Structure formats: structure tokens, C-alpha cells
């Protein structure tokens, strides 16, 4: 099973992220978002950032997860290449505890597209044939 695949969207970047469970989908979605920006295979997992989010549903949680990672990238000038996510149901919604691993942007990192924002446009999470997949469109 591939972790993610890109699809054509005019002036934006779109991808499907796949996983056997919701956590794996969220990890692969984060990896795909950073793959839009750089070759993540060349980004060392030298530093960690911890993220905690509570949202009312799966789609909102995915949006909030990616949006928080993009905020950290934009404010700390860091690229991520590895992710670990744990999702639990709580009384107030779904709670995500995640770790993103990467390093500060260096001259040697390939510069691809700049992601301006995560969008809700066409975002969905589907359960199909024992797998879960999520569609995400990023504003470039």
C-alpha cells in the first residue's frame, strides 16, 4: 500500500493519504504535505515538536493537524519528515497527540512549492475495503 498519491488541481496541490487506521492516514497526510515543499527523504529527524489538538470530527481534526504543522513550519522555519500520531475519543471530541520530527531549513534542502494554507475544499475521509483514505487540497 502506498502512503499517499498526488492528483491534479489547478493552482493547488491535492493528494490522497492512505492508511490501515486513522493515525496512519494522518501521518501520511503530513508527509505528503511536506513532500509538496521538499524532498522529505533528505530531511533528518533531528528535532521533535509535539502537537495536541481536540476537534469535533475526523475531517476537522485532520485540517487542524495539518494547519498546526504548517504554522510551526512557517514560524520556526523547520521541515518535517517523520510523524507519529495517536488519536483518542474524548467527551469533547477527538483528541490527537502527535510528534513531528525534522530539522531547520538548510541551503541543501530542495525548495519545491510553498504551501500557503490547508483548505477544507473537498476534504474528506473515507473507509474503503479495510483501508482509510483522506483527500486534501493545499493552497499554493
Curated annotation (Swiss-Prot):
Q: Which organism is it from?
A: Methanothermobacter thermautotrophicus (strain ATCC 29096 / DSM 1053 / JCM 10044 / NBRC 100330 / Delta H)
User: Could you confirm whether the keyword Transmembrane helix appears in this record?
Assistant: no
* UniProt GO MF annotations: calcium ion binding
Q: Name one GO biological process term.
A: tRNA splicing, via endonucleolytic cleavage and ligation
Q: Sum up the protein's function in the record's words.
A: Activates the tRNA-splicing ligase complex by facilitating the enzymatic turnover of catalytic subunit RtcB. Acts by promoting the guanylylation of RtcB, a key intermediate step in tRNA ligation. Can also alter the NTP specificity of RtcB such that ATP, dGTP or ITP is used efficiently. May also act as a chaperone or modulator of proteins involved in DNA or RNA processing.
Regarding protein family, the annotation reads: Belongs to the archease family.
Gene3D superfamilies with a match to the protein in the record: Archease domain (3.55.10.10)
Query: Which protein are we looking at?
Result: Protein archease
Specify which residues bind Ca(2+) according to the UniProt entry for this protein.
12, 139-140
Q: Which UniProt keywords apply?
A: Calcium, Metal-binding, tRNA processing
Metal-binding is among the record's keywords: yes
